[in-house]
C-alpha cells in the first residue's frame, strides 16, 4: 500500500495543469471569449471564466473577488480551486472532470438525473472548443 501511494505521488507532476486548449475552451464557453468584468448567472458570476464568489473563496487565493474580472487572475483561481477540489484530475490534465467540477462543483461526478444531463451538455460545449 505504501509503495502504491509513493508511486502515485512520484508519477503525478506537482503543479501539472490541463492543456492550453482547456483554458481556451473554458473561456469560450463561459463568456464567448470576452474579457473584463462580465456579469453572468443573473449577476452571481464574474469575469471571463464566470466565477462565483464561493468558488473564488474556496480557491483560497489571496486578493479580492473583483480581480476575477482579469483573465490571468481568474485562471489562477481556477488552478487553485482544482488543485484543492480535484487534484487527481488536475495532475492528469483530465479536461472532462475539470470542466464538470468547474460547472457543477466538487461533487459533480456523483450527480444524477437532470444535473448529470446538464453537466454532460456543458462538457459537450467544452469539447467543441478543445
Identify what each model region corresponds to.
Residues 3, 29, 101-105:
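Short acidic/histidine-centered micro-motifs embedded in hydrophobic/aromatic stretches
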Residues 3-13:
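Sec-dependent N-terminal signal peptides
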Residues 17-36:
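Short N-terminal segments immediately surrounding and downstream of signal-peptide cleavage
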Residues 31-37, 105-116:
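Secretory-pathway/luminal and periplasmic proteins that interact with or process carbohydrate-rich
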Residues 48, 53-110, 122-130:
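Alpha-helical segment that forms one wall of the substrate-binding/catalytic cleft
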Amino acid at each position: 500500500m505504501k509503495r502504491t501511494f509513493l508511486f502515485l505521488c512520484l508519477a503525478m507532476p506537482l503543479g501539472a495543469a490541463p492543456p492550453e486548449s482547456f483554458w481556451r475552451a473554458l473561456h469560450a464557453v463561459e463568456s464567448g471569449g470576452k474579457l473584463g468584468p462580465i456579469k453572468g448567472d443573473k449577476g452571481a458570476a464574474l469575469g471571463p471564466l464566470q466565477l462565483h464568489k464561493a468558488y473564488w473563496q474556496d480557491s483560497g487565493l489571496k486578493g479580492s473577488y473583483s480581480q476575477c474580472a482579469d483573465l490571468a487572475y481568474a485562471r489562477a483561481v481556477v488552478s487553485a480551486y482544482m488543485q484543492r477540489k480535484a487534484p487527481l484530475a488536475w495532475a492528469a490534465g483530465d479536461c472532462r472532470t475539470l470542466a464538470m467540477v468547474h460547472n457543477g462543483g466538487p461533487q459533480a461526478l456523483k450527480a444524477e438525473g437532470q444535473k448529470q444531463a446538464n453537466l454532460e451538455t456543458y462538457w459537450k460545449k467544452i469539447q467543441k472548443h478543445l
